[in-house]
Curated annotation (Swiss-Prot):
Signal peptide extent: 1-22
GO CC annotations, alphabetized: extracellular region
Key words of the record: Amphibian defense peptide, Antibiotic, Antimicrobial, Cleavage on pair of basic residues, Cytolysis, Disulfide bond, Fungicide, Hemolysis, Secreted, Signal
Subcellular localization(s) per the UniProt record: Secreted
Protein name, entry field: Brevinin-1SN2
Predominant location: secreted
Length: 71
C-alpha cells in the first residue's frame, strides 16, 4: 500500500511539472505569434497604401477634368 502511494505521488508530481513546462512553451509560442502579427500588419499597411496611391493617381486627373472642365 505504501509503495503504491509513493508511485502515485511520483506520477502526480511528474505530471504537474510536465504540465507547467508545456504551459510555459505555449505562452512563449503565443508571444512569438503576437510579434509576427505586428510585422504582418505593417506589410499589409504598406501594400494597401501602394494600391491606394495607384488608384488615386488614376482617378484624380479624371476628376479634376470633370470638375473644372479643362481637359
Amino acid at each position: 500500500m505504501f509503495t503504491m502511494k509513493k508511485s502515485l505521488l511520483l506520477i502526480f508530481f511528474l505530471g504537474t511539472i510536465n504540465l507547467s513546462l508545456c504551459e510555459e512553451e505555449r505562452n512563449a509560442d503565443e508571444d512569438e505569434k503576437r510579434d509576427g502579427d505586428d510585422e504582418s500588419d505593417v506589410e499589409v499597411q504598406k501594400r494597401f497604401m501602394g494600391t491606394a496611391l495607384k488608384i488615386a493617381a488614376n482617378v484624380l486627373p479624371a476628376a479634376f477634368c470633370k470638375i473644372f472642365k479643362k481637359c
